[in-house]
Design a protein with these regions (language model features):
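Glycine-rich, low-complexity intrinsically disordered segments
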Residues: 1-153
Length: 153
């Protein structure tokens, strides 16, 4: 016999903020999905016809954030830190990797979920597209690599 439970309330995806170490709160219009994949390692043992399966390497997909371009340079400056570090000039703070939280909120601003991305750093920055015939705002995006994510709340 089916049991009737409490109705579920699904989380809306339109309200979220991003908190980045040393950058503060940032408003973005879009955030790509978070995903993790565990490789499936198969091997055959002792002539068995059925493979043994076990978890392999874990990979976390990069996340892309998009927002309207403003005079704020924080994301570009962060990328510049990474560029200087990777060029071997040694002119930057070794702590270019930062933690960031993606905070999903309800309509009234109550935190529903908090995803923590650990040791993130920008791999790509796109300044946006310019068009004399367009009415839209310039949208900049940054793609971030990170070590792992976890659901905090």
């Amino acid at each position: 016999m089916a049991v009737i439970g409490n109705p579920r309330s699904f989380h809306k995806k339109f309200k979220f903020i991003v908190e980045i170490d040393d950058v503060g709160h940032a408003g973005f219009q879009k955030c790509s999905e978070l995903s993790v994949e565990v490789a499936n390692v198969q091997y055959f043992e002792g002539g068995s016809l059925i493979p043994n399966k076990s978890p392999g390497r874990v990979t976390f997909a990069d996340v892309t954030l998009e927002r309207g371009a403003t005079v704020d340079r924080d994301l570009f400056d962060w990328l510049q830190d990474v560029v200087v570090t990777s060029s071997g000039l040694g002119l930057t703070d070794p702590y270019y990797k930062r933690n960031l939280d993606i905070v999903q909120q309800d309509r009234d601003g109550t935190t529903l979920r908090r995803w923590c991305l650990s040791r993130a750093w920008p791999t790509k920055f796109v300044a946006g597209e310019w068009d004399n015939e367009a009415d839209e705002n310039v949208i900049e995006s940054v793609t971030l690599a990170y070590d792992f994510f976890e659901l905090i709340q």
